Design a protein with these regions (language model features):
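N-terminal presequence-like segments and the immediate start of the first folded domain
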Residues: 2-95, 101-154
């Protein structure tokens, strides 16, 4: 009996405004007919050297956390930029971010400020992202932890 591919939406590669998708850098994957997401990508494709962070929190260089959620996010994103730079990656090489937050309502109430902080650090590059609410993080005062994956083009 012949096997046929399942019917479903087709996949499009959407040009990314900050990345040359024709030759290097990640490509945004967007199924045709799906609404464009705001502030993230549904999927990414990339070829190159993988740079992966552990769970990163918003510690400053003295090991202190900001007292507020947006301050912790800003420092966390800055820490991610510093870590991936050690692997010769730039923010535009990010293909995935997984956010862990202890209070999703705090996240939702801060979207405008979070977007501003994100763009200041990573620009207008929006990789695939997931947001997960957790009961707490290992560091008791931490409000957010983010894992990042970047792919440095060959």
């Amino acid at each position: 009996m012949p096997v046929t591919a399942p019917k479903g939406p087709t996949l499009s590669v959407v040009p990314h405004p900050k990345t040359d998708t024709s030759s290097s850098g990640p490509q945004v994957l967007q199924p045709s007919g799906w609404p464009m997401p705001k502030g993230y990508a549904n999927g990414m494709a990339a070829d190159g050297r993988l740079v992966v962070t552990g769970g990163v929190i918003g510690w400053d260089t003295e090991g202190r956390l900001a007292p507020d959620f947006v301050g912790q996010v800003r420092q966390t994103l800055s820490n991610i930029a510093d870590i991936i730079a050690e692997g010769d990656a730039k923010p535009e090489h990010l293909v995935r971010l997984t956010w862990y937050v202890v209070d999703i309502e705090e996240y939702l109430a801060s979207l405008k400020e979070l977007g501003r902080a994100y763009r200041e650090i990573f620009g207008a590059h929006y990789p695939a992202m997931a947001l997960v609410q957790v009961v707490r993080l290992v560091e008791k005062e931490a409000r957010v932890e983010i894992e990042a994956t970047a792919v440095v083009p060959r």
